[in-house]
Amino acid sequence: MNFPPIHPSTPKMTPPDLDPQKIPQHIAVIMDGNGRWATSRGLPRIAGHRQGARTLKELLRCCKDWGIKALTAYAFSTENWQRPIEEVDFLMLLFERLLRRELSQMHREGVRISFIGDLTALPKSLQTEMERSMTETLNNQAIHFTVAVNYGSRNEITRACRQVAELVQQGKLSADAVNEGIVEQHLYTTDTQPPDLLIRTSGEMRLSNFLLWQMAYTEMYFTDILWPDFDREAFHQALLSYQKRDRRFGQVKALISA
């Protein structure tokens, strides 16, 4: 099945073979394969990141068109600082340029933008653009677009536990009152529902320290397609796979049906 290019004026049209009642409300993506995509074409790795950014933009609009309410993208992990300095510098500059160029359009389309991760380690100019984009789009409701930058799930969970421990130490919280809900209040994603579906491209089949707490019951879809080549049809296939699954959240089917 072929689809027309995504455009801001394109009306919302869910493919006819997808059940609108079973569309996942929150999708998370691990965008893997930019470097391999570029290398296979004799291009520098940064060309893959540039094309990968276009793919993410298209996916965001597709999610919006098809009624998906939240998209979370793993853009830069805490481990990615170990990449060549030229590549890291390019990625930081790319993030900043994309925000400056795309913010107005996303704001008009009703996109709410959020960032999760340790943003304090990022260049000051990038932090400024991130703060501006989050502030300007805070009340938008068409789709919640979250980008994980300098993010590591173990760091996030450790940070949350440390904050809860400080509350207990200060006498503001009883140790007996600490539960999953309390910890979740101190995660970066406190105002976002857990992902229904994780998509990872390029054939890798691991979580890579991404949303470990939040994805306890998330369905996972792995594809060999490299991220820059992940188009509407590939996304459509991921959603078809998701809709064929029986989500039980740790229960047996009889209890869910009751």
Swiss-Prot record:
Name of the protein in question: Isoprenyl transferase 2
Cofactor note: Binds 2 magnesium ions per subunit.
Residues annotated for Mg(2+) binding in this entry: 32, 219
Binding residue positions for substrate: 33-37, 45, 49, 77-79, 81, 83, 200, 206-208
UniProt xrefs under InterPro entries: UPP_synth-like (IPR001441), UPP_synth-like_CS (IPR018520), UPP_synth-like_sf (IPR036424)
Sequence segments annotated as region (Disordered): 1-21
Uppermost EC category: transferase
Pfam families with a match to the protein in the record: Prenyltransf
Function statement: Catalyzes the condensation of isopentenyl diphosphate (IPP) with allylic pyrophosphates generating different type of terpenoids.
CDD domains: Cis_IPPS
Gene Ontology annotations of biological process type: polyprenol biosynthetic process
EC number: 2.5.1.-
Gene: uppS2
UniProt-listed NCBIfam families: PRK14830.1 (NF011405), PRK14831.1 (NF011406), uppS (TIGR00055)
The keyword Transport is assigned to this record: no
Keywords, alphabetical: Magnesium, Metal-binding, Transferase
Protein family membership: Belongs to the UPP synthase family.
